[in-house]
Amino acid sequence: GDVYKRQRPECSHHEQGPGQNEIDFRYSDPLTAADNAVTFKAVVNSVAVRNGLAADFSPKPLMGQPGNGMHINISAKSRDGAEVMPQIIAGILAHIAEMTVFLNTREESYHRFGSSKAPRYISWSSENRSQLIRIPAAQGEYRRAELRSPDPLCSPYLAFTLLIRAGLDLSLI
């Protein structure tokens, strides 16, 4: 009961690969989001095993098919209401090379890049889903940047910590 109340999935749909599904969760603070990601994978694995199945969160379970990503949506605002998203995006772009080893922890993680809608270059776009960072047209509480390179095998705790630190890099101002 409580797990499902905290998780708050907003939508889900079948993705491009066989048996591949995307589940989007309601935004939350980084610690809650990391807890939810870990709990979600544990619940899915448990339900799959109970039903004689296996859930696969690996980045590239089937060669020649789309891989699995763990897109991270980031939104932030300063206490005084000043715009901070450009700085956060600049920090992530500046530090992504060093962070990638933690966001993509296995060799197969890199087989995913550049295929289907997985990013190939350090770039951003307002709508192109094949870019590293996508900035959806959403406004208000849903205004965000979406980092598309992490895969489901990364530690969400470490990933969120690295992204926050990169976004707060004041040397880029």
Q: Which residues make up each language-model segment?
A:
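Short, small-residue-biased leader/transition segments that mark boundaries at the very start
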Residues: 1-4
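Intrinsically disordered, low-complexity linker/loop segments enriched in Gly/Pro
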Residues: 11, 26-29
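Residue-level "edge-of-site" marker
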Residues: 14-15, 61
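Short, conserved phosphate-binding/catalytic loop or strand-edge motifs used
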Residues: 15-23
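Short secondary-structure transition/capping segments
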Residues: 22-25, 68-70
